[in-house]
Amino acid sequence: MLTIDHQAGVTLLRLQRPERGNALGPMLVEGLISAASEAFANTSVHTLVLQGEGRHFCTGLDLSDLATLSDADLLLRLVRIETLLAMLWHAPIRTVAQAKGRTWGAGADLL
């Protein structure tokens, strides 16, 4: 779902769900939160780069299971995405999103 590469002070986070347009499912969001937290805590990292594997950067929130989610589960999913977005907005290092193709909804918010 997510690959993490470190090189010369740059942490690259690559969304790995090309078959779903790199839509933000719960596991991917949690992986991004964890990886970003680690990058921000590492004093040798000066830049965080986000990329999407395949044709699209990120098509937003994964709604494929929306019909099966309770209101509480949907709210939690939205809160976690907002947590990720707030982390990136207030990042102590440079953040770069290399967007291509479709970049919708919460995917556009990553920019």
Which residue ranges define each predicted feature?
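Conserved CoA-thioester-binding segment of acyl-CoA-metabolizing enzymes
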Residues: 1-53, 86
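Hydrophobic/aromatic residues within transmembrane alpha-helices
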Residues: 13, 50, 62, 110-111
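Histidine-centered beta-alpha loop that forms part of the nucleotide-sugar donor binding/catalytic region
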Residues: 16, 61, 100
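Residues that form or flank phosphate/diphosphate-binding pockets in enzymes
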Residues: 23, 58, 106
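Structured helix-beta-strand junction loops
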Residues: 42, 53, 69, 91-94
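Glycine- (often His-adjacent) and acidic-residue-rich active-site loop
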Residues: 52-86, 103
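Glycine-rich beta-to-alpha active-site loop
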Residues: 85-111
